[in-house]
Amino acid sequence: MSKIDSVLIIGGSGFLGLHLIQQFFDINPKPDIHIFDVRDLPEKLSKQFTFNVDDIKFHKGDLTSPDDMENAINESKANVVVHCASPMHGQNPDIYDIVNVKGTRNVIDMCKKCGVNILVYTSSAGVIFNGQDVHNADETWPIPEVPMDAYNETKAIAEDMVLKANDPSSDFYTVALRPAGIFGPGDRQLVPGLRQVAKLGQSKFQIGDNNNLFDWTYAGNVADAHVLAAQKLLDPKTRTAVSGETFFITNDTPTYFWALARTVWKADGHIDKHVIVLKRPVAICAGYLSEWVSKMLGKEPGLTPFRVKIVCAYRYHNIAKAKKLLGYTPRVGIEEGINKTLAWMDEGL
């Protein structure tokens, strides 16, 4: 067992999933690539992806279903499973428990039952965030007792289950990766949202003083880290140091929070000569007011105290462990990643 013979990517039809397909497609020797998802693969791929869809085997199913999961693993004959399926932020807390906790429990159980050797789990850098500043955090930072939100709470629970499932005596090795601020082609939230802000004429507003450093990570780099983790777990010489461990994954270039937004806006020709700064305490009060008004009107609030805290917090991480043990180096820089994302958006897919 020294190479990836067959990989099953759970959540492979999603944003990160497409980048995972690309990274596994590009390695040599190329493994059999299988996708398990409740959604079909996109009918039309962006030019940013070069893999051949005909080479990808698709399995439709529910990751909380033991039968669906077992059938997909057995049919794929996967010796590596990558679990990146997760609902997006801002949804009902119940869906996070169903997918992130119950779904992950089922994935672990079926991997063990079917004799899978490697499980790589996509966690989140947000599992250590509770609204307080995060300065150069490494993997020794504790999970907070009071989580920031249901998404990160359930991600932390799932991560813990995956790490505790690591069992070298049964030839089952696990690892959890914690990417921060993912963006790239296929992103339906971050960059598209920033573009919409500019179109609405709101790019002149800034929440916070913009002195807070923040980690953004290109999706292709995150996918690359998953491939490296799988390879290290398959190698008898490196698996002991990697199995049962967590790793922060970033672009290793913390930037001031609003720098990415302004890079996007600049690329689109939106350059504001004057910026209106809304200080953090004022913005939090405005967030509470927005929530109250939106609740009265039965609408989703645009500004919330939660969003203000995220925008104003320091959140950057130390990836020395990933560099040393995984051999991870971000290959696509922030500006190049933004350009790739904008090019994808301009395709209108």
Swiss-Prot record:
Organism: Saccharomyces cerevisiae (strain ATCC 204508 / S288c) (Baker's yeast)
Enzyme class at the top of the EC tree: oxidoreductase
Reported function: Sterol-4-alpha-carboxylate 3-dehydrogenase; part of the third module of ergosterol biosynthesis pathway that includes the late steps of the pathway. The third module or late pathway involves the ergosterol synthesis itself through consecutive reactions that mainly occur in the endoplasmic reticulum (ER) membrane.
Subunit structure: Heterotetramer of ERG25, ERG26, ERG27 and ERG28. ERG28 acts as a scaffold to tether ERG27 and other 4,4-demethylation-related enzymes, forming a demethylation enzyme complex, in the endoplasmic reticulum.
Main location: endoplasmic reticulum
Protein residues bound to substrate: S124, Y151
GO molecular function, one term: 3-beta-hydroxysteroid dehydrogenase (NAD+)/C4-decarboxylase activity
GO cellular component terms attached to this protein's record: endoplasmic reticulum; endoplasmic reticulum membrane
Protein name per the record: Sterol-4-alpha-carboxylate 3-dehydrogenase ERG26, decarboxylating
Cysteine-cysteine disulfides: none
Gene (UniProt): ERG26
